[in-house]
């Protein structure tokens, strides 16, 4: 018997804003989305700050958004957990961090803090780094070094010097710490197996090889002079008296203070995995601490804040009911519809199929704003036609990934591409008498100009995101206001005729 699939299409990075300037969503020709918002029940959802377990006013992101949607409850984020631990002083009792501190003291060796120097709060937070430096100083560690990855994506494109000055001031106040290397996140935080990028960052941190500067400021200013913003600063070794300030050596301790896993895995593997073959590198004997668990298969690392587990996520619960589901996305967002959507669990649920469509190999996605949306659409249409699936979770990466480039014309094209694809998906779901829910995980492409400066804005926003219900019975349904991302899973379960498990604290959006 043909199934009536219930599908969730996540339009990544598509928020709502009344501002027309720099708003790729409102500038785009989008007949299908216009029709949806005119003819079908729709509402708006909170996707940032307290609504998703982040500090008040903190912009949402893809990881957090998918965790909350999949869990059907507010998931308190690593950012909030770590900040609280520092404020409460609990961090001084953290076993993994104590191991790193003790190793440096016992061997009279160095402790290196590596990570994204930013207050973006997506991958890291500068306040966590300051807390770690305070911990090292109070513990009597003298050799304290920072390997700073520069942001410019979750912060303004040319804001690195502000964070460098802030950090250097803090280190001067506590009396320990120097910046040893700087590297744009494009290199140090690649997640697409572009090992040549990771290698440049590795060479700077471990071998002391690469671009050279006498100060972090010099490295950044030189990069700006070459028209490279923070994200693209070439990995640079900071030298003093003609020698590197510090390199990572055997018997040192390393703390990687990024809390978001996806862009932290590759460089962690490059330093730690015995079987690593991405490029030639040293074998080091280190105490290496990751702030959170980046991947349970990474060898030889200590985890400071171990994952919390979530029972009865949407995928797990639907699986327990004997239903079959599909997760589909292109490479850039595949981890989000699988690992993050399942509450940080790598293993698929029973009867959970996955379709990974490769993202195009381009330097930046403004060069191909369509990304792989057409290929994702072709595949999902085939899968819907197979009549196998009760639930389908799909992600279109374009509004977010192209939004991050700051190139507004490309972002408009990205929205138009997704709109075209959505039209085909909508027609197919209605033909099958199924239900299609449309939402986003956070905002981005709807504000691509910093209204205070007029400069391009490449970061996410705190704007509300859309939520719409498309089905043949949609005219009989109404959606309530003041919802959050955690309310989506209970809504979908109601649409599937399933009870909501007690672990889900989200509430259905149907009135």
Curated annotation (Swiss-Prot):
Q: How is the cofactor bound?
A: Binds 2 manganese ions per subunit.
Is Metal-binding tagged as a keyword?
yes
Q: What does this protein do?
A: Catalyzes the interconversion of 2-phosphoglycerate and 3-phosphoglycerate.
Q: Which HAMAP family does UniProt cross-reference here?
A: GpmI (MF_01038)
EC class:
isomerase
- Which Pfam family, any one of them, does this sequence belong to? Metalloenzyme
User: What is the protein's species of origin?
Assistant: Clostridium novyi (strain NT)
Assembly information from the UniProt record = Monomer.
Q: What is this protein called?
A: 2,3-bisphosphoglycerate-independent phosphoglycerate mutase
The Swiss-Prot or TrEMBL record annotates one GO molecular function as: manganese ion binding
Instruction: Please tell me where Mn(2+) 1 binds in this chain.
Output: 400, 404, 460
Query: In this UniProt entry, which cysteines form S-S bonds?
Result: none
Which Gene3D superfamilies does this one have?
Alkaline Phosphatase, subunit A (3.40.720.10), BPG-independent phosphoglycerate mutase, domain B (3.40.1450.10)
């Amino acid at each position: 018997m043909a199934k009536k699939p219930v599908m969730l299409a996540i339009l990544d990075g598509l928020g709502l804003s009344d501002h027309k300037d720099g708003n790729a969503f409102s500038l785009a020709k989008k007949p299908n989305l216009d029709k949806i918002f005119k003819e079908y029940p729709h509402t708006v959802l909170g996707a940032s700050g307290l609504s998703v377990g982040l500090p008040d006013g903190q912009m949402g992101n893809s990881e957090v958004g998918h965790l909350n949607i999949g869990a059907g409850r507010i998931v308190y984020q690593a950012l909030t957990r770590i900040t609280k631990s520092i404020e409460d002083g609990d961090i001084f009792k953290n076993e993994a961090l104590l191991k790193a501190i003790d190793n440096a003291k016992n061997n009279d060796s160095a402790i290196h803090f590596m990570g994204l120097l930013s207050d973006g709060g997506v991958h890291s937070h500068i306040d966590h780094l300051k807390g770690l430096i305070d911990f090292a100083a109070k513990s009597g560690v003298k050799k304290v070094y920072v390997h700073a990855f520069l942001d410019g994506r979750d912060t303004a494109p040319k804001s690195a010097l502000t964070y460098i000055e802030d950090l250097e001031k803090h280190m001067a106040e506590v009396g320990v710490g120097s910046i040893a290397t700087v590297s744009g996140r494009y290199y140090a935080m690649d997640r697409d197996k572009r090992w040549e990028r990771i290698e440049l960052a590795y060479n700077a941190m471990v071998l002391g090889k690469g671009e050279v500067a006498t100060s972090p400021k010099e490295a950044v200013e030189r990069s700006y002079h070459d028209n490279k913003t923070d994200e693209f600063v070439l990995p640079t070794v900071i030298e003093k008296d003609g020698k590197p300030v510090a390199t990572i050596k055997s018997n040192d301790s390393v703390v990687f203070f990024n809390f978001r896993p996806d862009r932290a895995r590759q460089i962690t593997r490059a330093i730690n995995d015995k079987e690593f073959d991405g490029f030639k590198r040293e074998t080091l004997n280190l105490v290496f601490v990751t702030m959170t668990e980046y991947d349970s298969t990474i060898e030889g690392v200590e985890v400071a804040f171990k994952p919390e587990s979530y029972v009865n996520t949407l995928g797990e619960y639907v699986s327990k009911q004997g239903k079959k589901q599909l997760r589909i996305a292109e490479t850039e967002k595949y981890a989000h519809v699988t690992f993050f959507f399942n509450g940080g669990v790598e293993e698929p649920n029973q009867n959970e199929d996955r379709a990974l469509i490769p993202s195009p190999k381009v330097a930046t996605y403004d060069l191909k704003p369509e990304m792989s949306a057409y290929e994702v659409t072709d595949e999902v249409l085939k899968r819907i036609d197979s009549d196998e699936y009760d639930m389908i979770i799909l992600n279109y990466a374009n509004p977010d990934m192209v939004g991050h480039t700051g190139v507004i014309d490309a972002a408009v094209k990205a929205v138009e591409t997704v709109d075209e694809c959505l039209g085909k998906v909508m027609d197919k779901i209605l033909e099958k008498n199924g239900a299609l829910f449309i939402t986003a995980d956070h905002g981005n492409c709807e504000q691509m100009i910093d209204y205070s400066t007029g400069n391009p804005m490449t970061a996410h926003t705190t704007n509300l995101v859309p939520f719409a219900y498309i089905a043949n019975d949609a005219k009989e349904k109404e959606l309530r206001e003041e919802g959050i991302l955690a309310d989506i899973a209970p809504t979908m379960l109601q649409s599937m005729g399933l009870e909501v498990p007690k672990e889900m604290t989200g509430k259905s959006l149907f009135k």
